[in-house]
Amino acid sequence: MKKALFIALVAILSVFTALPALAQSCCTLPKNATDYIAKHFNGYEINFFEKDRDVLDVDYTVYVRNGKLSYKLEFDKKGNVTDIESESRGLPLPQSVLPANVVQYVKGAFPNAKVTEWSKDGNKQLVELNNDMELVFNAKGKFLRIDD
């Protein structure tokens, strides 16, 4: 009985000792992602991030915050940004994260609107405005249509 209890105690202690190393190795962001955050969200604090593994793919979700400004960022396995969403009730995304063609089109066509979400889906870029309108652009930032 004492031997079984001792083995169980050693096993539990081993697990708790290994957890910090395991957490660090499974939850480090790719360099492209950390560079992107440093460039576009300098001064923001990373509140939380997770690594999501599917059968064939890996992606990362990162939440950054600076005062009242909060954003959710998603990256692919190489650290390329795939989605940016404002978590701050209608507050816009930083213009630096958007392609120049997209910024120019939105300013010209919807001068009172702000971009609150951007995502890349294959060869398309999807943009959501604070008026709930969704715009579709090609990979180069050329406007294609308003999405229903």
Regions found by a protein language model. Name each.
Residues 1-27, 37:
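Bacterial Sec-dependent N-terminal signal peptides
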Residues 24-31, 61-63, 88-92, 104, ...:
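Phosphate-end processing signature that detects enzymes handling 5′-triphosphorylated RNA
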Residues 25-47, 93-114:
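Short, non-transmembrane alpha-helical segments in secretory-pathway proteins
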Residues 45-73, 118-136:
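Exposed beta-strand-loop-beta-strand "reactive/processing" segments of non-cytosolic proteins
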Residues 69, 84-97:
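Intrinsically disordered, low-complexity Ser/Thr-rich linker and spacer segments
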Residues 69-85, 135-147:
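A short, surface-exposed beta-strand/turn
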Residues 103-109, 113-114, 120-125, 139-148:
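Flexible "stalk/tail and boundary" regions
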